[in-house]
């Protein structure tokens, strides 16, 4: 194997030199060449790719005929909650529908991680298409919703928190992509306005921000959708949202593994950065929780729906935040036990195995495409008789 080729100027779509990807860091190594998946530095990313592919679905598989008539029966408060959440979810998945590929993909050094992020971005696009599908089937004029997403200041305020870390990294990474800074001899060059560690710090903050987005920011909206369905309202939409929730959990796990690999020393410099950014990361969690609580108050400003209000949602967001922080090795900071879900009835919507439906009635969430058990041995069926 040879080192990164010095004759490559800037980025390349295909590295023609032999680079051992199993010895590369996850990001900012040599450009990728052959997409080979027979060997992986981190098999967990290949496993996540297979898992996400097995969950593939399309919104058109779910009938929304009843949802159209259900929506007409909702009062103004319920319509405000349903529509506002749709608008915000569209914004989040518009960001995630292009963010991973646009920001992280160009600087990825492992084929198995590149593959996982490609599927991740594809599924986010399906989520965005799903919201359009819901809107087209529920509202007489879809433009009344879609044309006014960026007119809502509450949504724009949250959008800034979601996109700022992405944008800061994208702008800083431009010099890397347009130069030879990925080469060891060019890093930290005197002509560079920043060091490679500065750039990696922005990458960490972007990934940490996405981890929080995937793990917390959707869940107020999810809970509201499931609350309607518990009342036998907007059940088709809730079914689609449950597919999305299942996917987002996979994306959350992907970002958790990226951060954990950094913590374990995938890149020694990133390991230092993760430790240095601990307090800042905790502040990012706090800011997200505060914003989600404010969003819950905005949703329920004119009243509640049966089984759900802004107080319960605030407790739910704190509980989720504690879980997400614990998964990254941080101590929980909110007075919510990890064992006690404030909204236990949401769990069977988020866990696809908890939903029992007849195949002819709706899309079955627990059905996996291409799911194979590959640990069959010679004597596995020795006790079987025909």
Q: What feature does the model see in each segment?
A:
Residues 2-386:
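Non-heme di-metal
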């Amino acid at each position: 194997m040879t080192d990164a080729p010095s004759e490559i100027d800037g980025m390349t779509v295909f590295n023609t030199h032999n680079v051992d990807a199993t010895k590369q860091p996850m990001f900012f190594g040599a450009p990728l060449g052959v997409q080979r998946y027979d060997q992986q530095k981190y098999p967990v990313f290949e496993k996540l790719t297979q898992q996400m592919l097995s969950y593939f679905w399309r919104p058109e598989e779910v009938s929304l005929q009843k949802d159209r008539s259900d929506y007409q029966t909702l009062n103004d408060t319920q319509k405000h909650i349903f529509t506002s959440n749709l608008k915000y979810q569209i914004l989040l998945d518009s960001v995630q529908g292009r963010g991973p590929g646009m920001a992280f993909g160009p600087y990825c050094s492992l084929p198995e991680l590149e593959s996982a992020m490609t599927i991740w971005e594809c599924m986010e696009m399906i989520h965005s298409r799903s919201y359009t599908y819901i809107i087209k089937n529920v509202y007489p004029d879809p433009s009344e919703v879609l044309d006014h997403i960026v007119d809502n200041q509450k949504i724009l305020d949250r959008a800034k928190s979601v996109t700022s870390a992405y944008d800061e990294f994208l702008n800083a990474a431009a010099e890397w992509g347009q130069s030879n800074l990925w080469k060891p001899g060019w890093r930290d060059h005197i002509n560079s306005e920043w060091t490679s560690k500065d750039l990696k710090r922005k990458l960490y903050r972007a990934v940490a921000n996405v981890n929080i987005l995937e793990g917390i920011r959707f869940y107020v909206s999810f809970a509201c959708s499931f609350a309607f369905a518990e009342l036998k309202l907007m059940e088709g939409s809730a079914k689609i949202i449950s597919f999305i929730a299942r996917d987002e959990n996979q994306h959350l796990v992907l970002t958790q593994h990226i951060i954990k690999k950094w913590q374990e020393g995938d890149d020694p410099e990133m390991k230092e950065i993760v430790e240095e950014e601990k307090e800042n990361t905790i502040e990012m969690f706090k800011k997200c929780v505060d914003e989600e609580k404010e969003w819950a108050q905005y949703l329920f400003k004119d009243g509640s729906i049966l089984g759900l209000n802004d107080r319960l949602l605030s407790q739910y967001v704190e509980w989720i935040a504690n879980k997400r922080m614990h998964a990254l090795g941080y101590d929980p900071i909110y007075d919510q036990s990890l064992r006690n879900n404030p909204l236990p009835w949401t769990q069977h919507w988020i866990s696809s195995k908890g939903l029992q439906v007849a195949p002819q009635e709706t899309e079955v969430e627990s059905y996996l495409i291409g799911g194979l058990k590959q640990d069959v041995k010679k004597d596995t069926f020795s006790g079987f008789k025909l």
